[in-house]
Structure formats: C-alpha cells, structure tokens
Amino acid sequence: MNGNSKVHTEENKNEHQQEGKGGEQEQEQINKHINKDTINNNNNNNNSMSMEMDINSVSVNSLSEPTPNEQQNNNNNNNSNGNGNGNDETTSSKTTTIINSNPLDTDTIMHLNNNDSSNNTTTTTIPRQSSSSIQNGIHKEENINQLTEIQLQPSLQIMDKEQQMNGIEESTTIATQTTLPTNNNNNNNNNNNNNNNNNNNNNNILEKESNGVQEIEDSPNHLSLKRKLMILEEMGLISDDNNKNNNNNSIDIPNSNRLNQIPSSYKTSLYICLYPIGYAIDNIYKDKIFTYNDKISKDFLNSISQGKLTPYIINILDQLSEQNDQKQQQQQQQQQQQQQQQQQQQQQQQQQQQTNNIYQNSNEITYYNGCIVVNIKDYRGFAENEQIAKTFNSKNMKPYPITVPIGTFKEFIEKRIILKPTMESLLFDIKKNCSTLNNDNKNNNINNINNINNNNNNNNNNNNNNNNNININNNNNINNYLNIKESEIVNEEYLLNFEKCLLHAITPQLELSVNPNCFFDQLETKQKQLYNQSHSLFSYKRFKPSDFIGLKYPVVYNNNNNNNNNNNKSYNNISNNNNNNVSNRFIKTHSISNIQERQQVNNNDLSTISTQQSPPTLIQTSAKRSIITLNTQINTTNSCLPNDNFSLFKFLNSNPKWVNERKSMLQYHSNINQTQSFPFNYQFNNNNNNNNNIPVNNNNNNVITQPPFGNGINTFSIKPSIMTKIPIECEQLNGRLLQFFSTSNLTVLTFECKAKPTGYELLMYVSETTQVLNTLISLRNLKFTAPSTSTSSSSSSGGTTTTTTATGTTPTTPTPVPLTQQQLIQQLISFSLNKPILPLNQQSPLAEASYVLDTQLPQPTYLSFPIGNSKQAHFLINHMKSCIEHEGHYILSYDSSFPDTISSQAQEIRKKAEYIHNQQQLNQQQQLQYHLQQQKQQQQQQQQQQQQQNQQQQQQNQQQQQNQQNQQQNQQQNQQQNQQQQQQQNQQNQQNQQNQQQNQQQQQQQNQQQQQNQQTQQQQTQQQIQQNQQQPTQQIQQQNQQQIQQNQQQLQQQQLQQQQQQIQQQQIQLQQQQIQQKQLQQLQQQQQQQQQQQQQQQQQQQQQQQQQQQQQQQQQQQQQQQQQQQQLQQTRNLQPQQIQTQPLQQPPNQMAQSMISPQSTPSTSPSPQQQYQTTPVLQAGVQPQSQLTIKQPIQQPLQPLQQPQPQPQQQQQQQQQQPPQPQPQPQQFAQHLQQQQMQRPQAQLQPPQILQQLQQQQQQQQQQLQPPQILQQQYQTLQPQQLILQQQIHEKQNIHQQMLLQQQRNQTNLQLLQQQAQQIPPNNPQLLQTNQQQQQFVTQQIQHQHQQLLQSQSIIQQLQLQLHQQQQLQQLQAQLQQQTSPNIIQQQQQQQQQQQQQQRIN
C-alpha cells in the first residue's frame, strides 16, 4: 500500500426479479449507481491512468450482489457528491470497479493513480483476479459532466476441463460504473465519508478470506453448474438428456458427426423433373415447365451436371426458404381460423394438412457441410397416353411455363446428385452475408441510441429521487447524450457484436468440413449399387476438397486423440436468441473437444516457461496450435492439425497462455518506442518493482515470475503506470490500412480506417487478389496531392481533426481533377452493394457480379464497422489484428503503420501467393494469346469455308434451276401419261361391263335351255308312258333302258360342261395347290373304287333277297298246286285277276327308285309326279329273266360319271344348296321281285347259276371291306402331323413378335440419338461423330431385322398352307367313313343271311 489516501467505491444495486411460467429462468435487471469519491492530494507524481477489464472470463446473467455492510455504505453515499471541475485535461471524474467473486485471489491489489494538473488524484482499490482472467481496461480521455448507466448483456463462459473435474467454479463480472456530477458545494461531504467507506470495504474482504472455499457455493456471483448446462443447451452443444446424468460435476458433450450417417438419411433440397419439352422445379414452381433452350436453364443444368453450387442456385434456395417462412405464417393463421369453424369441415382440414405437410417436407433446405442434395427424375419417354406424349414432344410449344396434367407420367429414372460450392459461390456468399450484416448493424445502432436515451432518462429520475439538491434540465439531457457518444467505453456487448460480425465475415461459410471424403465415398458406393451408370443423366464426378476451389495449398486436418470422431464442425445456430436473420449455412459452431484439448496443452506448457533471449516468432508460438501445411503431397493422417479452431467463445475462455502469446507477438512486431502498436491496456513504462508477480494457475497458488524481455525491459513483471496523455500516433488513425492473406481459400482481407464526424469507421474489403491495397494507397496519395476540396471537422472526443475526402462522397465544389483520379472516383462510386436478387426469369447474378482479377479498384464486397472515438478505434483495431492472426487461416501481410515489421512466414506466403498469381496471369496471357491465334485461324477457316459455301451455293442454285426445269418437263409428261392411262382404264372398264353383260346373257340362255330340256323330257316321258301302255312289256323294257341311257348321257354332258367352267375358274388356284392335287387324286380314285364296291354290294344284296323270295314262292306254289287240283273248276276264271291285282299292291315309286342309282345327282332326279307316272310300266306281268337283264345295263352308264369329280369344297357348297332327297328303298323292290317269282313256274329256276353268283358276291364283299380300314389308318396319321405343324407355327410367331419388339426399341434409340445430336453444340465435333456412328449402327440393325421379319412371315404362310391342306383331307376322310359305315353293317347282315340259306340248300 502506498502513502496515498485510499478511496473505496461503493455500489448501489436495485434488484428486479421476475419469475416466468413453466420453470423459466430468472431475469435480473440491475441499475447501478456509482457515486464519485475524490481526495485531493498534494503529490506531484506523473502517473498514467489505466483501467483493466476482464474479457476472457465473464459470468452469464449473474452480477455481484452487495453485502449488508455494503448496502449501508451505499445508503450513506447516496447523500454524497463528488468533485467536478470544468477543465478538459486536468480533472477526471470517472472511476471503475471490477468486483471479483473468487476470494482466493484477493492478495494482490493494483494501484491506479491519476495525477491531474490540479494535483487532484483518484484511486480505486481493485482486488486482483485469477490468472485465468486478463484485464483489459479502457481509459477515458476527458472530464465527463454527466454519465448514465449501461446495461450489459450476458456473455458466455466455457470452463477448463480441470475446473470441471475438480468442481471449482469461477466467474467474474464486469461492471462499468458511472457517476453523476453534482455541485461543488457537496465536496466536503464526500471527503468526510471516504474513511468510513474504506473501512467497510476492508472488512468485507477479510470476511471473504476467512470463509475460504465455502463462500464460493454461497456467493451470489457464482456461476452454478446448472446455469452452465443451460447455457450449453442454448448454444446447441449439449442435449437435454445429458442434464439428467450429471454425476461428479462432469459434463459429457457429444460431438455432432453428420458424415457418419447413412447417405439415404440426407434430405434433398431441390426436386428437379426432366420432361421431353423442358424441366420443372417442384419446390418453387409446382407443375410449371421451363424450356431447355434458354441460356439460364443451360447454365443451371450444366452446373448441376458438374456438381457445382453456383450463386444462381443459392438465390433459388433463398427464395425457397423465404417461401417456407411465409407458408408457415399463413398456415398458423389458417389453423386459428379453422378451429372456429364447425365440426363438419374436419375431414377437409385433415386432407389439407396432409397435403401441406408433404409440401413442407419437400421444401425444407438442409446444408451438409456447405453441400446440397438434389433429386432428379427423368420422365422423358414414359408418357402414359400417346396424345400427351405427342403434345409434349411437339416443337411448336409455347415458351412460357405450362401446366402439367396430373397422372400423365408414372415411370421415371431417378438419381441423386450433390452440389458443392465453388470459389464464386464463396465470394458471393460473403458478399450477401456482409450486406445482411450492414442492414442489421444499421438497425442495431438505431436501437442502441434509443436504449441509451431511455437509460439516461431512467438514471436521471433515480438521481432526482435520491438527491434532492440535484436539478437537471432538458439541456443537460442533450449534453449527456453527446458526452456518452464521444466517450463510450468498449463494453462487453459491443465487443461481442464486433467479434460476431468479424467471425461471419472472415470465415468461409460454405467451406467443407474436416474429412468430406467419407461422405462422398459412401454416397458413391450407394449410387453404384442402386442406379446403373448407363442410365445416368449427368456425368457424376467424385468431389475432393481441392477440386471445387482449385487450391494450390489445400487445407489439411487431423483426427483428435481424445475423441475418435473425425469431424468436429457442425453447422448449427450459435444461439436461438440471436436477432440476426442469418440462415443455417452462414453460422458455424465448433465442438468443445478442441477447446478442452487445447486447455490441457496450455496448462502443461505454463509450468515450463523459460527465459527468452529473443522474442518468440509466429512459427514458434503457433507450432502447437494450428499450422496449415502448404505442401500438397502430405497425407491427411500424418499432418499437423488445428487443435483449436477459431470460435466466438475463444475470447471468453480463461486461457492465459493465449494472452501471453498475443503480448509477445505484439511486442515482436513493434518497436519499444512505438507504444501505439500495443492495445491500450498493454502499454507499460520502464519502472521496475519487486511485488509484481501474477499467479498463473487457479488450482495451485504457485507464482511464476517471468524474466525481463530484451534490453532489461520487463513485460509481465512491470507495474502499469497511469498515462496522462494519449500519443499523437493513436489519434492519427485515418487512412490506416491492414491486409491479411488466407491460407484455406486464397481470399484477401483489406481493412481501412476512415474518420467521420461522429467517430471512426472500419471498412473491410474481400477480394481474390492483393491489388485492392494498391488501389487504396493510390487513392490516398491522390487525396494528398489533389487540391483542398475536403471539409474539416473536429471530433468532439479528443479534439483531433479529421478530413473527409472525395473518395467516399462527391465533391462540394467543382475542382480540376486529373483523368486518372476522376476515373478512379467514378468507378468507386459506380459500385453498389444493395442490388436486388434476380428471379428465375431474369439473368443470373453472375453477370452483374464483377469478380475480375485485373481490376485496380476495391471489390464491391465490403463490411463497415463503427469503431467510436480514437481510443476505442485504436483498441478495436489491435484487438481485431490479434484475433485474425490467432485464428490460423489468415496471416498479416501489410500494416500501414508498421510496413517493415512483417513476419517472415507472411513474407514467404506472400511471395508464394504473388508467384502463383503471376503464374496465373502468365497462364491467362498465354491462354489469351492461344485463344487469339485459334480465333484468327478459325476466322481464316471460316472465310475459306464461306467462300466454298458460296461457290457451292452458286452450283446448287444452278442445279436447282435445272432441276426445276426438269421437274416441269416431268410434270407435263406425267400429266400426259396420266391422261392416257385414264382413257385406257375407262376403255377397259367399258369392256369389262360389256363382258359382264354378255356373261349374264349366256347364263340366262343356259337357264332357258335347261328349262326347255326339262319340259321336253317331261313331254317325252308322258309320250313314252302312253306308248308303253299299248306296247308289250319286253319292248317297254328296252325302250326304258334306252331312255335311261339317253338321260344319263345328257346328265353327264351337263356335268362335264359345269366342270369345265369350274376348272377354268380354278386354274389360278391350282398353281398354288400343286402339293394337294396328288393327295386329292388318290382320294378320288379310292372314292371311285368305294362307289363301285357299294354298287356291287347292293346288287349282291338284291340277288340274295331274290333267292329267298324264290324259295318262299316254291313252297307256296307246291301248296297252290295241291289246292288247284282240287278246285280247278272254281278258280279258272279268277286266276288272271289275281295275277293283275298282286303287283298293284306295291307302291308305284319303288320301281322308279330302283331303276336309278342312289349316287345320281340332284339335277337328274325326277320329281315325285314323274316317278308316279313311270309306275304303270311294272303293272303288267314281268318275267323273271328280265330282272337280271335290267341290273346289268344300269351299272354301265354310271361308271363314266365317277371319273370327273368336283373338288371337296365345291361338293360341300352343292350339298348345302341341294334340298333333302328321299333315299332309295331296295328292300321294297326286292319284295316286289319275290312276289313275281312266286308266280313263275319252278322249271325256270337254275340253282347252279345262283350258287356261282353268290360266290362272286362274297369275293366282292371281302374286297370292299379293305378301304374303310385304310381310311382309318390315314385319318390317324394326319392328326399328329397337324399338331406338329401347329407347334411350329406358334414358335415362329413368338420369334416374330420378339423381333418386332427389338425393332421398336432400336427405333426409339435412334430417336433419342437424333434428339441428342440436336442438343450437342457445334463446338464438339467428336461428340457429333460418335453420335452419327451410333445412328448408323442402329439403322443397320433395323434393316437386318426387317429382312429377318420378311423371311419369318413367308415361312409362317407356308406352314399355314400345309395345315389347311391336311384339314381338308381330314374332312374328306370323315365324310367317306360316314358313307361307308352303314354299307358295311348291311353287308355283314347279308352275309349272315346267305350263310343260313346255303345251309338250308345243302
């Protein structure tokens, strides 16, 4: 303790606790009032004032509560007032207190002395914090008349692993306290109450030390384990299930590893359907089709086929996310309205909800490490209806979107593709993110101003209630706002917002994770199993981390030792309470495993700190953190790893080693005299003291002293001294430039500090090259060389003047400007960031984004940060510099304040990057030259081709003229020929008509002749009947025989004429049926033989019947002779009457039917009247000899009729036309003959002759029995032949159908090849050649198949002819069997009767 008087500051806290429903967290809002305590001292020591704040260890929603003793002191202090002097640089009325919740670290007390020109000093007693917390204090520059309170938002803290295991929990609170100035009349009261306040504070400190560790659990500033778990849940790093299993105060946080999941579980973000006429995007434009011919659609599909996530697709996905948000809001409103409706509409609501859920699931967007899954369905060639297919395949469709009928396409080919981001998409993403952040910052600034005004009013009201002597006017409120704006402290809230914006801007949001090969390997294997490569619509490419960016220096990662998971990055929200409207792909959180592992290494390394003869370099300090190897051939397994990734919570974590490294880096990169290179709280003097040891570890109270740093200057063991004045270098921040290189994606960050009337502003430019810095330097030089066109404005904070040049705004007065400067200014002004995103129907945003490598101006992608006054700007710039350097992926390449102190590593990387850039430029120049040469050659070739084409066109024109003349001549000739042909055809038609008329006349004549013949026959028969009645019986028989012969001859002649006509008509058919004629001839001969046999059989039957009748007659005659002898006299007169009456008992039709054979044709059969007229011939007495003579001539004229027989088809037709005729009755005729024989004398019988005849008849019957057996054998052989032919025909028909299907497939393939040939650009002759070759091959296959089809048709026709012939033969045989079967039965019966007769005769 020094001899200076002590001043103890006190706190006054008003607690407001609100308990929410459902177990919500308690919210504490505390208004802090700090009174001013000053003591006038006579010491003239020149000391500097410094205030330190703890950023790395901050509690969440917990502030220090006052003890009862402190509350009494606060009540006493409410009536006191502080000294307030009106001088600017002599007095200061601000004090800050940092209250520590851990009583173990209260041994050391730091002294901050402030020596004003009026010898008035204010000191504050601040308990030392642990080594885990590093204090970053901020000095206020001016005397403040009135200050208000600033409410702090809660920050987050992640504990060390050792602290979590041992159960030791620490937290500190930062309280930026302000005081209100009062009148100078109350200064004495403050001086009187200082000693009492100091004593109370000392008593409180001693009480805490005596309680020890037990005070930790009961202290209100303590951050409990439950609260830590709640914070981790809000961050998304731990689930609710882990809260239940919290034994031994340990936290098990699972690492999110999405890449180890099954590829099928990944959700698709875009659904694309390919139709014959165009494509559709089902997520956004449902049932609408876009054409393939548009440039936008070509770029869109090409990017998908190449697997690239372009900025155009990002815009589409953003539109989709916006639509999803709107749909959710609409659905919520609809649900509220639907609940009020009746119960009858519940069914409709369920259906609507089902459909809405389907659309919601399909519209969700999910990013997997910056990648998207796209689902493609190809419906081309799978239309259900032919009409719909024709409409879609037609080329006369309208260009605007059309609606697709539902259910038209059912079959499709499906494929899933992954899109990865490119360099253009990364830059576009940063640009879009920066634009959203700028809009958010503007809104936040407005809200902060309103909050400050409200806080000022509340504080003023509280002070009026406590202090009756204070009266504040409205003018004082305005002065308060201005003073706060000028001297605003860089508090915790502002620092967090600054780091968030910096994190979003620096990190590439769409960069892939640690080991993406697992994801793509799994997906590739699944796609090979599920889908054939032949059906692939787009060329699938295997993605690698270095492919999509084209890096010369790929990022190499390593697996963690403690955790087996390969991936530690997860794209989740940092917290659900963020108001920034940023999508999931913009936010990237990190797992805690890296932080815990880093803390173990740091705690082990702190104990082995040794003396350093020279400052540590970047390579030495970052060797154990994250070195990104630049060698492209290093394997992923043996590479150095980033054990600590850049995170927002890194700055809040208690890690003293990182702070020490930052100090050493800052000291190494700056000279000792240039103190402005350090942050404000790290500026020290050369005063050496002995009691300046800082504890490093919280668990052990061992104090590690660090040796001095070069030239006897200590950095860690030096007591900080108070600074009376800020150096000029700190205030001259306008135009400061910083540049950083990226090692992961070769982006360049350039920062520029500009002065404005309200304060300083930091601009960040994102580009691909280093030329942005050169343009800014050239603009800065032009600003100084140009005439004075700027307006000067003095900053109210520190009295320094800042100038605003014409680079950002237009000049107020017209001044002559050189051409170079004017061009640069116009080009700078022309850039506009807030441009609208174009929809689908307009051009893509890539056309507007000017990502040109050779531009000499800053890119339009920038981000602005309001920094504040000179002190705040100086602090934040150095803070930003250290953050980016420690992040690992960016290295400092240029600093305008220290251009010569750049690290060796940065110089090497810069040289390599410049070398690569120069090589790229050379390659581009060579490519340009090569392209120019090719273009010249192409132009020359095109000119030659055009000349050749012109010549060919002239020749073609001449040929066309000749062809036209030839065509005209040919047309005339064709017309003449057609006329002649028509005339000939007319003549032929006339002749045909005449011939037809003649034929009809001939047929009529023939019919008339037939009628006349019939009439003549009837007349002749009538005449013959009359003559027969008069002539004797013998003459009548002869005449009858002659007439029968004549009739038969006439009938034969008529049949021959008809057959000749039929033969003439069938000559054309006989040529095709030569194979059948032989078989038909054989069958005809068989039929003739069968007919002859049948006639012989009939004759034998008649003879047998006659013999039987004769025997019966002999018996009767014997009986009659005996009777006659007895009655001769009585019966003499009656005998002639009996002889006449007995033959009349027979029917008259029997004799006529017996005279004609049963096989006679229907045309020759007489009518029943004619038959009845012929019966009187047999009424007279007939002798027995005439029976034999009658049957012999009947058989002779029937034989020539059997030779010319009509074909079976004609016979069937004639049989259908003929009416049914009565069959002959041979039995009745036989009975009639028997009665006649009974009347004859017995002397006329000759038994030997009868026996001979019977033997002949038996031989004939045996011969007639053979043909039916032969017919049965032939009938049985024909059936298996027909079955064999039918099987052969069936097999040939199946083969024929398969060949037709193959021909149709080849035709469809040819159509597809023709469509592809139309889509192929003319720049690819190789593809055209391959396509033409494929078309030729397909056409050859089609021709070959056509020939095979013709051959198979001919074979099938031949087989069908054979089968038809066999069927006809089978029908003929069936008919013959039907005719022969009844004859055979009769023959068998007759044979039995004959055998009986022979037995009787013998």
UniProtKB/Swiss-Prot annotation:
Which stretches are tagged as biased composition: Basic and acidic residues?
7-29
Q: State where composition is biased (Low complexity).
A: 73-102, 183-204, 786-812, 1136-1150, 1157-1174, 1199-1218, 1226-1250
Domain of life of the native organism: Eukaryota
What are the boundaries of the region Disordered?
A: 1-29, 60-107, 114-133, 177-206, 786-817, 1136-1174, 1199-1250
Q: Which Pfam families match?
A: Spt20_SEP
Q: Which residues form a coiled coil?
A: none
Q: Where is the composition biased (Polar residues)?
A: 60-72
According to its UniProt record, which protein family does this protein belong to? Belongs to the SPT20 family.
State the protein's name: Transcription factor SPT20 homolog
